[in-house]
């Protein structure tokens, strides 16, 4: 094997170098062949191994022929397999033909009627027919009267509804239309008396009926009457105070020790309880 490769790579002058590729390649191949020779010389086809493991061809010849069909009778015949009892019962039930139910006719016993019984039977039949005819006549006459009464009731109800609707549409005497629309300012001036001080709408008193229709807010005259004779206090305007502060006028020398009480509304009646206001 090494000689074949060495012959093809002998001319080393073709590659332009002194290195001989053929010699190195052949030496490597010979060493590899030498190593693998030991494995190649081993004998795997021993008699003991072949006897325990038969070849595949023996199995193929046993279960198949040239056409590829199975030759085993037990595997080919599926009917030979055991079947459970319930399966056998199902198969036998399916094999039966459906049967139609037979109807048994039983003849009723015939009774022999005598002449007296026949006459009684016929008379009863005639009485029943006459009663039915009478009932039909009475039933036919009643619906006509009831229909007329229902029509009268419907007409009466319709007339009542029309009368009620016309009464609703007419102007009721309780609610009269508003003739004049008064402004808020005029209403507040009438209630309060001083239009410039209070321009807010007067709140409605919830229990005004219980209190006798008390107007709210109360007028200044009513407050004075309830409060009694109040002491006339001197009024200080803010403009006067500002003017005095700007000019720097000081009148402390003219004032007495009790002057500040009268100036800021603290008179001789401060701290005293007037009992005439209490009931």
Swiss-Prot record:
Task: Indicate the segments annotated as coiled coil, or none if absent.
Answer: none
Region entry Disordered, spans: 1-111, 137-233
Taken from the UniProt entry, a GO cellular component term is: striated muscle dense body
List, as start-end ranges, the regions of compositional bias called Low complexity. 1-29, 45-59, 170-186
From what superkingdom does this record's organism come?
Eukaryota
- Comp. bias regions, Basic and acidic residues: 30-44, 221-233
Mark out the compositionally biased spans (Polar residues). 189-205
**What is this protein identified as?**
Uncharacterized protein F15G9.1
Q: What is the lineage of its organism?
A: Eukaryota, Metazoa, Ecdysozoa, Nematoda, Chromadorea
């Amino acid at each position: 094997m090494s000689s074949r490769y060495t012959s093809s790579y002998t001319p080393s002058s073709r590659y332009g170098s002194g290195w001989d590729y053929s010699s190195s390649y052949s030496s490597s191949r010979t060493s590899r062949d030498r190593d693998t020779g030991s494995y190649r010389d081993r004998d795997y086809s021993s008699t003991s191994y072949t006897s325990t493991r038969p070849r595949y061809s023996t199995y193929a010849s046993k279960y198949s022929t040239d056409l590829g069909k199975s030759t085993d009778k037990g595997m080919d015949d599926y009917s030979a397999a055991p079947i459970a009892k319930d399966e056998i019962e199902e198969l036998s039930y399916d094999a039966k033909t459906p049967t139609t139910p037979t109807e048994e006719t039983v003849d009723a016993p015939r009774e022999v009627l005598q002449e007296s019984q026949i006459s009684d039977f016929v008379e009863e039949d005639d009485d029943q027919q006459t009663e039915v005819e009478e009932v039909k006549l009475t039933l036919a006459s009643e619906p006509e009267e009831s229909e007329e009464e229902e029509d009268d009731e419907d007409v009466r109800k319709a007339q009542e509804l029309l009368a009620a609707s016309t009464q609703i549409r007419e102007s009721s005497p309780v609610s009269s239309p508003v003739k004049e629309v008064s402004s808020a300012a005029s209403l507040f001036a009438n209630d309060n008396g001083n239009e410039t001080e209070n321009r807010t709408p007067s709140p409605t008193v919830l229990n005004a009926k219980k209190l006798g229709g008390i107007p709210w807010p109360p007028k200044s005259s009513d407050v004075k009457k309830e409060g009694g004779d109040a002491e006339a206090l001197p009024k200080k305007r803010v403009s006067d105070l500002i003017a005095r502060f700007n000019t720097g006028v000081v009148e402390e020398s003219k004032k007495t020790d009790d002057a500040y009480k009268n100036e800021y509304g603290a008179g001789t009646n401060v701290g005293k309880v007037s009992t005439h206001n209490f009931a």
